[in-house]
Amino acid sequence: MSTYTRPVMLLLSGLLLLTLAIAVLNTLVPLWLAQEHMSTWQVGVVSSSYFTGNLVGTLLTGYVIKRIGFNRSYYLASFIFAAGCAGLGLMIGFWSWLAWRFVAGVGCAMIWVVVESALMCSGTSRNRGRLLAAYMMVYYVGTFLGQLLVSKVSTELMSVLPWVTGLTLAGILPLLFTRVLNQQAENHDSTSITSMLKLRQARLGVNGCIISGIVLGSLYGLMPLYLNHKGVSNASIGFWMAVLVSAGILGQWPIGRLADKFGRLLVLRVQVFVVILGSIAMLSQAAMAPALFILGAAGFTLYPVAMAWACEKVEHHQLVAMNQALLLSYTVGSLLGPSFTAMLMQNFSDNLLFIMIASVSFIYLLMLLRNAGHTPKPVAHV
């Protein structure tokens, strides 16, 4: 049986369009807020509102999928995100945008959970690794193309919202031509997310997803603002964000291979150390291009390696619950990161963005160095 079946290809095609819309908004919303003369802490709170929506969406989607299936859940998630996009144009203000970004966050998280769960149920233990790799490549390619779009098109609010909303709705079209079945829904008793979070042997993976959420949430939410305060134009900000994301794309395959060959614990240690080096390089302002590249290559690949570490510790039928728990952990980190970092930037210096990233990475590195064990043979390849 082919790994990349027709439902899988159509699902990933729709995801690509949705990711383009998500990337454009994640870059431009902080800039639009800054243009409305909102303070740095307000920008951070709006970013955190989006990730709060991610948290709520992650918790709700399992129930939604069980009730209405993958296809309808995907349609519903897309409509919710489209509403969050269009709502930004109804009223410009801190409180209204706080609400609409929350709505967009719910829709975005639902899209992620639906797609990831559909891929998990479509695959087997032999091809889930390839499916997950394809998923992450599509996600990062869509994000990269979204950053390039920002550098090429008008970034005015009312110019962007119509086509971004249309792009979101277009992401529904591929799934109209196929049906994604949940063939494994009744094969095993459901596993709770809480039990996965409490699993002692998977703690390094869970902690890694939290740290990854803090790092990427801060970069996505506050990096455009950091560059804006440095006098970088909106078009150039899109370019530099594309550099950051392209490094993450290029790093996926080689880092995954290295983790398989040398063990995920060793690779995680090296990755976190490189994130610290990249943050220090950004603070030195010596060469932003290579600094952003190594920061993106190491930072954007933390989540899949940490996720693979945790998934090694569970049985085959627990993989979906574990992935939900890891996405929830990532979302919590994404929620905390921009909020606390924005407050530090507001009260002290914009450089606190990279000091914060380096600090939490150092804490995780200490956790990894304390682990003297070895990476066991995987229970399932995810």
Curated annotation (Swiss-Prot):
Residues 35-44, 100-101, 152-156, 225-234, 346-347 are periplasmic. The chain crosses the membrane at residues 14-34, 45-65, 79-99, 102-122, 131-151, 157-177, 204-224, 235-255, 270-290, 291-311, 325-345, 348-368. GO terms for molecular function: transmembrane transporter activity. Residues 1-13, 66-78, 123-130, 178-203, 256-269, 312-324, 369-382 are cytoplasmic. Signal peptide: none annotated. Its main location: membrane. One of its GO terms (cellular component) is plasma membrane. Keywords: Cell inner membrane, Cell membrane, Membrane, Transmembrane, Transmembrane helix, Transport. It holds the Pfam family MFS_1. PANTHER family: TRANSPORTER MFS SUPERFAMILY. This is Uncharacterized MFS-type transporter YcaD. It comes from Escherichia coli O157:H7. The gene is ycaD.
